[in-house]
Amino acid sequence: MGLRKLKTDEEFKHLIRPLLRKEYLQLEQNLLADGCRDPIVVWHDVIVDGHNRYEICMRHGIPFDTKDMEFECREAAIAWICANQLGRRNITEETRKFLIGMQYESEKVVTRIRNKIGKNQHTVDISSMNDEEADKACRHWTAQRIAEENNVSAATVQ
């Protein structure tokens, strides 16, 4: 535990619903009373989860742990943030739809990168397909998986 200097990425922070004043004050009281129990999640010293905890801990000198995550690229980090936020109860339906869309768009980019370097995560052989067919197949699989994870239709995701 310590007071490690971390960086904030505005795009990452924007994906996380800001706390209401009451929620922020409650978090601050909890951190002052109990310390920081959950680690700040980071990718190359950039916060991907725990922006509010980090801000409060730094202001009050509260030690915190970090959990270093490894992502293939920025889009993979964005997809993780979206999926993580979708698991929370305090998001509006509008925010939920936005996050599902951002996760889908980010994962499409990650899939394209993986396909170019031969790390396709699907068992179906797409090597015989042209680039357009392979891209369409990967978009379909990605949309289907995200839809199932969020109890919506694949058409809603796309």
Where are these regions (language model features)?
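General small-molecule cofactor/ligand-binding pocket signal
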Residues: 4-7, 41, 65-70
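Charge-dense, helix-prone N-terminal extensions
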Residues: 2-3, 13
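A generic secondary-structure micro-motif detector
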Residues: 17, 42-43
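Acidic, metal-coordinating catalytic cores used for nucleic-acid/nucleotide bond scission
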Residues: 44-49, 53
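N-terminal BTB/POZ boundary and linker segment
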Residues: 36-39
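Amphipathic, charge-rich alpha-helical segments that serve as recognition/docking helices
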Residues: 12-28, 32-34, 53-158
